């Protein structure tokens, strides 16, 4: 059983992440870190406003980071150093140095660090890749 702590309660977590955790029999929602603790009421779990306390008290094994981009690296690193596996929303970090620090924290902790690039498997994205490979739509010069 994997016990998840979700950091950030926005569209992606309420529409996709938390429902997926609740639907998976091998996963359990251990708690939520949010600025608005009442958001946890809908899920019947405890809420924290302080990540450090949540990591210590929730009993989680893994953390899903879905906060503003500027918080991805520091929250992921803190979670990894606390011995938790981390799945972080994209972008992983604001720059290369932050990404390297995250990877280093994962290596030092022996925990897994993943980035939630779920759209890469969308049929439309795969079709765009095919069209690019075939030369049908030219060479990409920028992607977002």
Show the residue positions of the predicted features.
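A contiguous active-site-proximal alpha/beta segment in oxidoreductase catalytic domains
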Residues: 93-144
């Amino acid at each position: 059983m994997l016990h998840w702590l979700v950091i950030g309660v926005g569209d992606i977590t309420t529409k996709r992440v938390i429902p997926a955790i609740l639907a998976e029999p091998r996963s359990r929602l251990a708690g939520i870190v949010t600025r608005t603790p009442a958001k946890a009421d809908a899920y019947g779990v405890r809420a924290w406003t302080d990540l450090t306390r949540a990591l210590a008290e929730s009993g989680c094994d893994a953390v899903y980071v879905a906060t503003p981009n500027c918080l991805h690296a520091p929250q992921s690193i803190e979670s990894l150093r606390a011995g938790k596996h981390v799945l972080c929303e994209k972008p992983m970090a604001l720059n290369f140095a932050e990404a390297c620090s995250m990877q280093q924290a994962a290596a030092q902790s022996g925990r897994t660090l993943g980035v939630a690039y779920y759209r890469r498997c969308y049929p439309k994205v795969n079709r765009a890749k095919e069209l690019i490979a075939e030369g049908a739509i030219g060479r990409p010069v920028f992607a977002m």
